[in-house]
Amino acid sequence: MITSDPELFRRMSAVRSPFTRGPWYAALKLHPERDNITSHIDERIHADLRTRMAPGYSGKENLHMEYDIDEKLLHMFDLMNSKYVSRPEDSIFRTMDLSRMTSFFTLDVISKIAFGQTFGFLDKDDDPFGYLANLEQFLPAIIVFGVYTELTNIMKMPLIKGALPKSTDKRGLGRVMGFARERVQERFGPKPIVRQDMLNSFITRGLTQAELESETLTQITAGSDSTASALRIALHFISTSPPVLDRLLAELSTAIAAGKVSRPVIKDSEARQLPYLQACIKEGLRIHPPVSGLMAKRVPDGGARIEVDGVEKFAPGGTQIGWNSWGMMHDPEIFGVDCEIFRPERWLPRDSSEKEQARVLRMTETVTLNFGSGRFGCLGRGVATMELNKAVAEVGRATCMQTYVSAVMRANRFPQTLLRFNLQPCSLAKPFNQKVIGFTVHTDMNFIVTERMTAEQQAAAVQAMGEADADAGALPGSYDE
């Protein structure tokens, strides 16, 4: 069965719920020999791992977490500025694939905060061992095995097992597995490296070297792809929605002027206090949910009564119930009749009435299910939201759709906070390619990046635009709003 009912999803995931993780989760066993926190079906083992791993994700024991994220964000900006800035006045045009750039950013972030060492994707501006392409090929197989669970038995066959990724591989998922293994071994060697990071927290709480080799691989895959997907979708919709961009820039400008935004990168605590920024992030998570895997729960042996379309029905024991993330996040009863539209304003209370507060709360409780719920909630939620808070704010305030530049210049309302660059999608007709394979994978999200205009350049451009209109015989006032 599949449900788009958030109440049922929460009920199945509640701490004392008799529902358990179904065999779908077993397909998430990325290491060929060992399970991980996402693939364990045994509830006791899963609960024990969550207890021991949660402090490492909280940030309280990872003193470098926010600094490391800031460092990688600035690294990404440096790369964009040095390699991808176009100069139309010199007929120099370069394209940047935002889907790859955001993946490089999140992969380097998770490796840095987990191990204290990055893969170097941003350094190389490349995927040197073909990890992303290999993962795109590997994910559909995981989803098929999760649905047709009997197929997982063939993974035990020597011929198939030998073809699976190994830590000795030079490319793809196996190379990531090898990187994780090397970093773990450094913490257990004769001269172990000690650093206040996630890995150290896990070791302190008794995870073995073998367990860590499996868990760190899961950290990398699950912790980077979903966040990158959420980030690029938010940036895409913000950059292609001028009213949204204007309002976000206005909020950030006001906060900066009031000294409520740190430089060079906004603090996570500051970003959480900006209502429209938070609305943009939530709307991005809603409009294109980053995770689409079923996450199927198993009905207890005695069966359970569940509500379907307002009618209570009996589900036999052993039934698998997965979630429909798209249906849940596009439910008009929860998000309004315009739920197919990217409109962050839906998250802002229209008044202080209890009814309005309840409406926003219901939406918020639903969209947070993108991170799971209850005893199955994502441990990395805090890390992911910190990345989104910072990256959407910093890139969003540095972004302006050049498709609409002329209209903005005519109105003479260029925002003064475009500190870094403008972004223009290369194609509005087909802005990117997309595959829904457990995660929502985007490719070819190509943008043109240009330097921002100074105040003097803006004034000159406005004057030049007016002269061009006169030369073209434009009607007076034809561009007035």
Task: Say what each PLM segment does.
Residues 70, 92, 130-137, 239-291, ...:
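Cytochrome P450 I-helix active-site segment
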Residues 82, 242-244, 354, 363-364, ...:
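Cytochrome P450 heme-binding "Cys pocket" and the immediately downstream C-terminal segment
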Residues 201-210, 265-283, 294-323, 341, ...:
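Cytochrome P450 C-terminal beta-domain/meander region
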Residues 323-358, 464-465:
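Conserved cytochrome P450 K-helix/beta-meander segment immediately N-terminal to the heme-binding cysteine loop
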Residues 22-30, 64-231, 247, 268:
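Cytochrome P450 heme-thiolate monooxygenase catalytic core
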Residues 226-239, 391:
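Short, small-residue alpha-helix embedded
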Residues 1-65, 107-108, 126-155, 324, ...:
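Cytochrome P450 substrate-recognition site 1
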Residues 6-28, 44, 48, 312, ...:
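N-terminal membrane/targeting module of cytochrome P450s
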